Amino acid sequence: MPHYPVLKLSQRQIEYVNKFNNNPKIKFEKISCLNCSSANQKILFTNDRYGFNQKTVLCKKCGLIFLNPRMTQNSTEFFYKSDLYRNVYQAGNKSYKTEMIKYISSAYEEFEKNPKKPFFDIINSLNLKYQNVCEIGAAGGMNLKLFQLAGKDVLGYEPSEFLSNFAKTKGINVINGFIDDVKGEYDLVILIQVFEHLLNPIDVLKKLRKHIKKYLFIEVPGCITKFSSIQNAHNFYFSLNTLSHIVTKCGFKIIYIDYKRGHVNDMVYALFEKTDKIETYQYNYAYEVKKYTRIYYKYCIKIFIKRVLRKILRKINPNFEKKIVNIIDLRGS
């Protein structure tokens, strides 16, 4: 199994990665596959893109890719609430709050110039009838702003107090809270790059179902044609098949599901409708496993080639090495 390529980190990031890897408060637990309950798994990587000691595995029965062992509930909460998470996931040497204020302000300025996002275009193209929208993990409220501009009633829940307060300054009602704090019913509930962070998405879907009148929209970085950016904050890496299987067995039917290729991640977009008739989506497990095993070995070959090239080019000319090696996209298919 290859060592997943680690990004070039700032000194602050390196410091906090080491704090995580050597922190006795961080506990891990082994789990069975969320999708099929199998314990038969192949280890793909032993670390993530930041250097966290975190294994990523492929279920040999159904093809779901996930972290295992993964952080326990208490350790996950500690990770997100402490300074470990944000001080690694932002690249500068300044504090998280300083970097986040700069980032979110800049992002909003760009957004206001061109208020557009792929998931919103997809929802509009489906001609749905809905009025009120709830977003779980609403961050600074940009996603909800799109719906507000379209005349919809919006409400969000965001675990970060800083981000929920920022959203309010932009006229978006975002409550500082998460899944267990949701109240009321909504025509449309959206989870934009949140589902992959959950420890148990099935439990969350069962809780959310009672708050959904009609539709559920999910956007996740997926594994379709290549491996996504492997990181310890993403507990699962879904394909069209595995996402469909998990969501439909929780009382939803598929209205739309597709993906778009990106430089780093394949993005999966899916709309589901609440239904009382549960018909779990079925797919060919063996083919799924074969597909991702093939993608994995192709990826390993790319890693090997890049490392060999680096060694050779480093001896010739260090600057020439950087230019040539960057041509190879390690995360490509």
Feature-to-residue mapping (PLM):
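Flexible glycine/acidic-rich beta-alpha junction loops that bind and position SAM and/or redox cofactors
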Residues: 224-229, 263-269
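Conserved N-terminal segment of class I S-adenosyl-L-methionine
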Residues: 1-188, 192, 202-205, 266-268, ...
